[in-house]
Amino acid sequence: MANEIPTKGILKSEALKQYIMETSAYPREHELLKELRKATVQKYGNLSEMEVPVDEGHFLSMLVKIMNAKNTIEIGVFTGYSLLTTALALPEDGRITAIDIDKEAYEVGLEFIKKAGVDHKINFIHSDGLKALDQLVNDKCEFDFAFADADKSSYVNFHERLLKLVKVGGIIAFDNTLWFGFVAEDEDGVPEHMREYRAALIEFNKKLALDPRVEVSQISIGDGITLCRRLV
């Protein structure tokens, strides 16, 4: 297919990637997450690459636990692998506000979320991300942790809203910020359908690096994830 998504991730050694997955990622993966991953592949084929990889899921789970987060927000849910990962990591009284414009994809994962007994933790908002964030800002909501994995060209606008929603000391995580490694390559070598997000993410990464309101760490896991700790 002309628009087939390249194999996700910035780690180019297939042998090393397989070692990481088979040694620590797959053995620790929750059974319902495994089932959800398989269901996503069955329904979406190559597009299942939009889901976070297993090792990144472990990273997010540990981060939420280390932070003792209780109130989180996720923009961009797809079938809910990262959403279920977070729900399993939160305490019984933890809550997630999940936003996505594609309710059909979310419902693929809802079956497994219910099986895990964590559906009571999730408030799903069927909406465009920016519209939903603006409403949450108006409602003066507050979160400990945010995970953004939606329209990459909207990351700058997501960031401004999330700085109003995530408490001082909280974490905002942006996924895919290294975009298959294309951010470090000349545009001529990048597939045409990947160039728009590449350009948007290059500019976004520059803005984050210069933003005095956050402390930034870019993590080379999955397709690249950038952590922003709110300072002011």
Swiss-Prot record:
Pfam families the record matches: Methyltransf_3
Positions of transmembrane segments: none
PROSITE patterns: SAM_OMT_I (PS51682)
Keywords: Lignin biosynthesis, Metal-binding, Methyltransferase, S-adenosyl-L-methionine, Transferase
Catalysed reactions, as listed in the record: (E)-caffeoyl-CoA + S-adenosyl-L-methionine = (E)-feruloyl-CoA + S-adenosyl-L-homocysteine + H(+)
Entry cofactors: a divalent metal cation
GO MF terms held by the record: caffeoyl-CoA O-methyltransferase activity; metal ion binding
UniProt xrefs under Gene3D superfamilies: Vaccinia Virus protein VP39 (3.40.50.150)
Methyltransferase is among the record's keywords: yes
Binding, S-adenosyl-L-methionine: V52, E74, G76, V77, S82, D100, D151
Gene Ontology CC terms, in alphabetical order: cytosol
EC number: 2.1.1.104
Pathway(s) this gene product operates in, as recorded in its UniProt entry: Aromatic compound metabolism; phenylpropanoid biosynthesis
Binding site for a divalent metal cation: D149, D175, N176
Binding locations of substrate: K8, D149
Cofactor remark: Binds 1 divalent metal cation per subunit.
Record SUPFAM superfamilies: S-adenosyl-L-methionine-dependent methyltransferases (SSF53335)
One GO-annotated biological process of the protein: methylation
Annotated function: Methylates caffeoyl-CoA to feruloyl-CoA and 5-hydroxyferuloyl-CoA to sinapoyl-CoA. Plays a role in the synthesis of feruloylated polysaccharides. Involved in the reinforcement of the plant cell wall. Also involved in the responding to wounding or pathogen challenge by the increased formation of cell wall-bound ferulic acid polymers.
UniProt record similarity statement: Belongs to the class I-like SAM-binding methyltransferase superfamily. Cation-dependent O-methyltransferase family. CCoAMT subfamily.
Name the UniProt record assigns to this protein: Putative caffeoyl-CoA O-methyltransferase At1g67980
Native source species: Arabidopsis thaliana (Mouse-ear cress)
Biological classification of the source: Eukaryota, Viridiplantae, Streptophyta, Embryophyta, Tracheophyta
